[in-house]
Amino acid sequence: MLTIAMPKGRIFGEALELLRKAGYTLPPEFAESRKLMIEVPEENMRFILAKPMDVVTYVEHGVADLGIAGKDVMMEEERDVYELLDLKISKCHLAVAGLPGVRMNQIAPRVATKYPNIASSYFREQGEQVEIIRLNGSIELAPLIGLADRIVDIVSTGRTLKENGLVELEKIADVTSRLIVNPVSYRMKDEAVDELVHRLSEVIPQ
C-alpha cells in the first residue's frame, strides 16, 4: 500500500482532480471528509491530510511514502526526499512586496516573511544586508505597521497585496506543487511509485 501525504486546502482539491484524471477511483465524499487519514483499498492507497509545511516532514521520516508539496516548501527547507514530478498545479510565485514609493531603510532594512531561508538567500544574492523577521501569518500587515520595509511571500492573483495597499516589487521564483518521495520507499516500492508517476505524467496540465 502506498501512503501519500496531501496538503489540506486548495491544493488538495487540485491534486484529487489530477489523481482522478489519472484513472484512480476515489470516493465522491473524499474531498468533504474530516478524517485526517483515509484508506482507499480499491487502489491500495492511504492518504494522510496535513498542513502544507508538514507534508515534507511526513515523507522525510517515512510515515508517508510520497507527498505533494509546494516548491516554496522545498526551497525553504532542505530535506532528505526526492522530487519526482512537477504537477503544475497551484501555480503562484514568490515575490518581494512593499508599500508603493517607499524605499528600504538604508541603516537597518527589515524583511518580514514565513520563508526566512529563501529571503536571506535572495537578498544576499542581491548584495543587500537585511534583518529577517519571521512571521507565520498576515505577512502583509508588517509594512503597514512599520514592522518591516519589505515582505517576501507567495503571490497568486495579487489581490491580497492590492487590498492592503502593497505592490509587488521583485519576483523571486515560480512555484508549483511537486510530487516527492521518501528515498527508502522509492527503493522498496519502486514499481508502485513508478506507475503513479507514469499515470500522473500523462495528465499533467501543460
Curated annotation (Swiss-Prot):
PROSITE patterns: ATP_P_PHORIBOSYLTR. It comes from the Bacteria. GO terms for cellular component: cytoplasm. Keywords: Amino-acid biosynthesis, ATP-binding, Cytoplasm, Glycosyltransferase, Histidine biosynthesis, Nucleotide-binding, Transferase. It holds the Pfam family HisG. It is found in: Cytoplasm. GO terms for biological process: L-histidine biosynthetic process. Its EC number is 2.4.2.17. The keyword Chloroplast does not apply. It catalyses: 1-(5-phospho-beta-D-ribosyl)-ATP + diphosphate = 5-phospho-alpha-D-ribose 1-diphosphate + ATP. Pathway: Amino-acid biosynthesis; L-histidine biosynthesis; L-histidine from 5-phospho-alpha-D-ribose 1-diphosphate: step 1/9. CDD domains: PBP2_HisGs (cd13595). It is an enzyme of class 2 (transferase). GO terms for molecular function: ATP binding; ATP phosphoribosyltransferase activity. Catalyzes the condensation of ATP and 5-phosphoribose 1-diphosphate to form N'-(5'-phosphoribosyl)-ATP (PR-ATP). Has a crucial role in the pathway because the rate of histidine biosynthesis seems to be controlled primarily by regulation of HisG enzymatic activity. Heteromultimer composed of HisG and HisZ subunits. Belongs to the ATP phosphoribosyltransferase family. Short subfamily. Lacks the C-terminal regulatory region which is replaced by HisZ. PANTHER family: ATP PHOSPHORIBOSYLTRANSFERASE (PTHR21403:SF8), ATP PHOSPHORIBOSYLTRANSFERASE ATP-PRTASE (PTHR21403). This is ATP phosphoribosyltransferase. The lineage of its organism: Bacteria, Bacillati, Bacillota, Bacilli, Bacillales.
